[in-house]
């Protein structure tokens, strides 16, 4: 009986954690979904951004008390401007997507929204990119990956 309970908690923790991509796995996925070079942003920059935003975790969330909004998913897309979580006051929902969809293991919708954000605001829309990737050598993020 104890073994079943422990097994149940293990499955629950995996479901709550979501998918944590390996670096090269994410590089291949982002390339397949068309982010490599999209709007002039290299694949290495996208990997740097997602490393610092979410540690490559699809279920990452971060609440922002000042704006009463939450950042969701592997790109940490904000509910005030880009997705609908049903609880953020005066939300815009610029990507016309549910925030929960941005946390799916299949990151196609998250990538589509990231493309919209970078098209409208550039890569500088992400604070983590400005802090950790801009003006840095980001080539190590794709180093050793078979693309």
From Swiss-Prot:
It catalyses: Hydrolysis of (1->4)-beta-linkages between N-acetylmuramic acid and N-acetyl-D-glucosamine residues in a peptidoglycan and between N-acetyl-D-glucosamine residues in chitodextrins. Residues 19-147 form the C-type lysozyme domain. Keywords: Antimicrobial, Bacteriolytic enzyme, Digestion, Disulfide bond, Glycosidase, Hydrolase, Signal. Gene3D superfamilies: 1.10.530.10. It comes from the Eukaryota. The active site is at 53, 71. The keyword ATP-binding does not apply. GO terms for molecular function: lysozyme activity. Stomach-specific. The keyword Hydrolase applies. Residues 1-18 form the signal peptide. InterPro entries: Glyco_hydro_22 (IPR001916), Glyco_hydro_22_CS (IPR019799), Glyco_hydro_22_lys (IPR000974), Lysozyme-like_dom_sf (IPR023346). Belongs to the glycosyl hydrolase 22 family. Lysozymes have primarily a bacteriolytic function; those in tissues and body fluids are associated with the monocyte-macrophage system and enhance the activity of immunoagents. PANTHER family: LYSOZYME C (PTHR11407:SF28). Lysozyme C is capable of both hydrolysis and transglycosylation; it also shows a slight esterase activity. It acts rapidly on both peptide-substituted and unsubstituted peptidoglycan, and slowly on chitin oligosaccharides. The ruminant gastric lysozymes, which digest symbiotic bacteria coming with cud from the rumen, are much more resistant to inactivation by pepsin than are other lysozymes. This is Lysozyme C-1. It comes from Bos taurus.
